[in-house]
Regions:
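Short helix-coil boundary/hinge micro-motifs
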Residues: 4-151
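Short, charged surface segments at domain edges that flank catalytic/cofactor-binding sites
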Residues: 133-176
């Protein structure tokens, strides 16, 4: 059974690609984007082609390491191995397991992802949990110097800005400093 504590632990334990001191921010940025939208009442699942690809690519270009190319399909697909993420319409994708299919397949087959039903219900029942998870992600994966900017950018990418989400994240962050 899902609880706040088990979800917090699952978020803390997400697998992150690392090379030396470098860490990939892909999964944390995707989770922050999804949580911001849940805060505003978004449905459980996000269509990769219309709701995730471009938005996450923008976040990766702004807050990710300098690279020739970013691959927002990687965290979208690979989060399913972290115990709380669900994907739908994957049966026609050429790849299964942890290796992600090409972006074209995710779009063509309308692959959608988001928190699984049990954890989504928990977030809907306890809206304060969304803010505390966002704070947890910001603190664990982003330097203090860009945490506020990261929260702002995620809000700007959303079509309808919810100023309360940013305030909750910042308030939660300052309480734990």
């Amino acid at each position: 059974m899902a609880s706040s504590k088990t979800l917090e632990q699952a978020i803390a334990d997400i697998t992150i690609w690392r090379k030396g001191e470098q860490r990939a921010p892909h999964k944390p940025l995707l989770l922050l984007y999804v949580l911001a939208n849940y805060q505003h009442g978004h449905a459980r699942l996000f269509d990769y082609g219309t709701e995730v690809h471009e938005q996450l690519l923008n976040l990766l270009e702004r807050f990710g390491p300098q690279r020739k190319a970013h691959y927002p399909n990687m965290p979208f697909w690979r989060l399913k191995g972290d115990g709380f993420w669900d994907l739908k319409n994957t049966e026609f994708c050429s790849t299964t397991g942890s290796k992600q299919p090409p972006v074209k397949e995710l779009v063509e087959h309308n692959v959608a992802g988001g928190f699984d039903e049990e954890h989504f219900a928990l977030l809907n029942k306890n809206k304060n949990l969304i803010g505390s998870l966002a704070q947890q992600i910001l603190e664990a994966h982003f330097p203090e110097s860009i945490q506020e900017e990261s929260a702002d950018e995620i809000q700007q990418i959303r079509k309808v800005r919810d100023p309360l989400f940013r305030q909750q994240v910042l308030r939660a962050y300052t309480m734990n400093v």
